[in-house]
């Protein structure tokens, strides 16, 4: 939504372009169609430049500061689009927060849910078999939408924190550069002042000699 965060926004835009261009290069008979859902003012301005033969942009009121209700509504719309067969895949491009000094560009497949995303890692045989009540399908129908929503919330929150961290780093860098420039100017001023005083002293000495 805002600037003054270094290359944060531009890196997200470049990653989005990379995904679209890679899909275009891999096209066979049927071209891949893209629908971009920008979140934030900066992203919306960028997305409008992508509109073309196989790229469409869907405007939404979503921002990085949207409430939990707005995120749930937005995620529900994407899920319904997927279930209706209007889209084959939903991916989220965001910046994953690692630390205050490290943020990583990430692309996460939201739908369809990859089996690897649901894997727990280590397999423990003693915990098998599981009993599901009332049944597996009912539980999946209840849990999976919550999983998709939590994944979207995590991506938006992580991106928001990364944006603030990038802004702090950018402002700190700008502050350090300003101090360095000020020191250089102060040094140059002192040199010029010293030269001026020396020149005046030489003029005075020269005048007395005359």
For the regions a language model picked out, list residue spans one by one.
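C-terminal beta-strand-loop-alpha-helix "lid" module of Rossmann-like NAD(P)-dependent dehydrogenases
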Residues: 2-210
């Amino acid at each position: 939504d805002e600037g003054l965060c270094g290359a944060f926004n531009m890196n997200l835009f470049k990653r989005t372009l990379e995904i679209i261009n890679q899909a275009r290069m891999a096209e066979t008979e049927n071209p891949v169609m893209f629908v971009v859902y920008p979140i934030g003012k900066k992203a919306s301005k960028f997305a409008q430049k992508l509109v073309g033969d196989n790229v469409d942009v869907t405007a939404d009121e979503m921002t990085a500061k949207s409430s939990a209700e707005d995120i749930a509504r937005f995620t529900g719309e994407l899920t319904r689009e997927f279930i209706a067969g209007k889209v084959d895949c939903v991916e989220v491009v965001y910046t994953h927060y690692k630390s205050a000094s490290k943020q990583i560009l990430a692309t996460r497949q939201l739908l369809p849910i990859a089996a690897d995303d649901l894997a727990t890692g280590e397999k423990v045989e003693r915990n098998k078999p599981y009993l599901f009540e009332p049944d597996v399908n009912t539980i999946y129908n209840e849990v999976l939408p919550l999983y998709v929503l939590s994944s979207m919330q995590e991506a938006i929150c992580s991106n928001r924190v990364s944006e603030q961290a990038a802004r702090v780093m950018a402002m700190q860098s700008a502050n350090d550069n300003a101090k360095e420039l000020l020191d250089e100017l102060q040094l140059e001023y002192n040199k010029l002042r010293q030269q001026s005083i020396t020149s005046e002293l030489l003029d005075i000495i020269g005048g007395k000699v005359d």
